[in-house]
Amino acid sequence: MSKVLVIGCGGVASVAISKCCQVSDVFTELCIASRTKSKCDALAAKLAPHTQTKITTAQVDADDVQQLCDLINAYKPDLVMNIALPYQDLTIMDACLACGVNYMDTANYEPENTDDPEWRAIYEKRCKEAGFSAYFDYSWQWAYKKKFEDAGLTALLGCGFDPGVTQAYCAYAAKHEFDSIDTIDILDCNGGDHGYAFATNFNPEINLREVSAPGSY
């Protein structure tokens, strides 16, 4: 049994929530929270007839730590599942620490303003010197490691599809299916365009940043 607060109700979050509701014996209660509550309500109404999971909804601004704390303290989840934008990772982690709740996300933190002088200095030092060209870096979230350890809490990072599910598939294959593996190629694609003239497999802005950046090997 578990009680999970899901923050986010976009394309990725909707799929993750739908999958959770297929395993009602594990995800017994879900609260879907987003800046736009009507989107949460619509998804809850769509899923409710097909699941035993108890679904509730809430409105929250994930940029506001106090709002997040108020919601977490009111709902009292076992886990906060952050499927909002990566710009909001740190505020949600701060709220989880303040409220004593475990944390999980699907995408590593990056600042919304990549021209911010403080961030640029860290980016130049930690990312560019290491050969990275994408506008993100796990060091911001790794800085929370001791805080979560001291609080007796777990923060599970990067549990999306790639990275995330693909790593689990690779680890399973290496352990159970193959004697040895030399290389693994991972290709991202969509299952159709879903009626959109421009269909990405994640948040369009972030997707364009990623595919236009030189690869790091």
What is the role of each PLM region?
Residues 13-17:
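N-terminal Rossmann-fold NAD(P) dinucleotide-binding loop
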